[in-house]
Amino acid sequence: MNNEIVKKWLSSDNVPQTDKDIISKMKNEELELAFSNAPLSFGTAGIRAKMAPGTQFLNKITYYQMATGYGKFLKNKFSNQNISVIVAHDNRNNGIDFSIDVTNILTSLELEFICLKIINLLLRQLFSYAIRKLNAQGAVIVTASHNPKEDNGFKIYNETGAQVLPDDGLKVVELMPNVFEMIDLKVANDDSLITYLNEDIFRQYYEDCKQALIKTNINESKEFSIVFSGQHGTACKRLPEFLKLLGYKNIILVEEQCIFDGNFSNTPTPNPENRAAWDLSIEYADKNNANVIIQVDPDADRFALGVRYKNSWRFLSGNQMGIIYTDYILKNKTFTKKPYIVSSYVSTNLIDRIIKEYHGEVYRVGTGFKWVGDKINKIKDSEEFVVGFEEAVGALNSTINRDKDAYQAAALALEIYNECLKNNINIIDHLEKNIYGKYGIIHNDTISFTFVENNWKELVKKSLDKILKYSEKTIGNRTITSIKYNEVGGCYDWILDGDSWLRFRMSGTEPKFKVYYNLYGENLNALSQEAKTINDQIKTLLNL
């Protein structure tokens, strides 16, 4: 801890009195955690942290610091060029104020701006789309996706619409000024450098999204009921609007969760990957006799599908949706070039079996959609895009942008659901009988272990070291054929017999240790039980 920084913080006019009161009551351990000379650094998906006073948290001063580093980075990269940057925020608390702080810093560096009016909450995928459409050089969005309400973030993009890669992230951090330079900084907004986007960008985006669709007839009215929750986020109004343009007329809003609320007051978790996020949606579905539920997270990049199946509810994972998308697109779309998929190393490998039939290829990348976007940028024109996805309910179904896109994912998922209805088959049976029956029965899952200790990264690294040094030849009933560190994937691999594997990594956005399962077998129930047995063995090994 630097005592001079703390003193400076307490005397600065840029620090509100409420924050000064909080600092004054901090214990030494809390001050050590909150204050240091080191700037914040980028994780899997930008910079995310708690909103609080201190150099290691998010506040006006650290946003000044981050925005200055990014602005200098852009000026270095695009020297002697006009630079346009898009700035926006999602629905999180303080998002408006922080986006204004970012804008004020960047305009002080004389960068031209394109940004949405404050009243319009920006959909993250539209952000990526707008960069490409408007030929901008970069973008900043104030968001922490589905993180807890106490958090916010700083996510930056390059001129292709993809999130910046680690090397560029390091350059931005290196260009961030010392926090002493930011504490008493005074900046003013220069409106002459700001252009505000209007509704045209949404209409253009909706039109271009249709290229992700194959059989959807927008003039055909789809009468089945769809329950929708926006988890208090940016898609609460826009996604139903978009789906109605595609002919889905009977959309039932989960009213309590379709209002903008940075506190996420009416949901136990805003992450549709978690089962608890679905409880209220199920109540709505049961009340309205609906058989399908769709959800997106607050910044509308994650999409998830739930369907009624044999008097219960099934929620499809990112892996399952990736498999369904892959099979459907390859079967129903005409490809004039070699088809390709981009997916992470920790995502299912059943797609490799499917695309092999079509003489295509799967490109594997590290965890984080920035790697998916980057790989798409590098693929030659002699190949044709199928889908990009991760196991964490995130997909991209066309190349109009370079980030996960819940709008495209929802539209294609509902098209497939509608086609299954026409063929009198539940989408779950389609997956487990038609697809698994042809390509192999597989159990994919992700188990997360959450750490509450401040030194959680050190604890996770110790766990990963045990994984690498594991000396047994089996796990569960599986033979371990090799154990290695996957440098590109950023994970530790246990390669098992029968085309199966386990992978382990530290989360880049939350204090979690993650285990990824990819197990083939003869029976789904047996595979599920086997995964539980393996999970118990791993917990014992790591003392979790």
UniProtKB/Swiss-Prot annotation:
One of its GO terms (biological process) is purine ribonucleoside salvage. InterPro entries: A-D-PHexomutase_a/b/a-I (IPR005844), A-D-PHexomutase_a/b/a-I/II/III (IPR016055), A-D-PHexomutase_a/b/a-II (IPR005845), A-D-PHexomutase_a/b/a-III (IPR005846), A-D-PHexomutase_C_sf (IPR036900), A-D-PHexomutase_CS (IPR016066). It comes from the Bacteria. It catalyses: alpha-D-mannose 1-phosphate = D-mannose 6-phosphate. Signal peptide: none annotated. Its EC number is 5.4.2.8. GO terms for molecular function: magnesium ion binding; phosphomannomutase activity; phosphopentomutase activity. Its cofactor is Mg(2+). Binds 1 Mg(2+) ion per subunit. Keywords: Isomerase, Magnesium, Metal-binding, Phosphoprotein. The active site is at residue 145. It is an enzyme of class 5 (isomerase). Mg(2+) binds at residues 145, 297, 299, 301. Belongs to the phosphohexose mutase family. This is Phosphomannomutase. It comes from Mycoplasmoides pirum. The lineage of its organism: Bacteria, Bacillati, Mycoplasmatota, Mycoplasmoidales, Mycoplasmoidaceae.
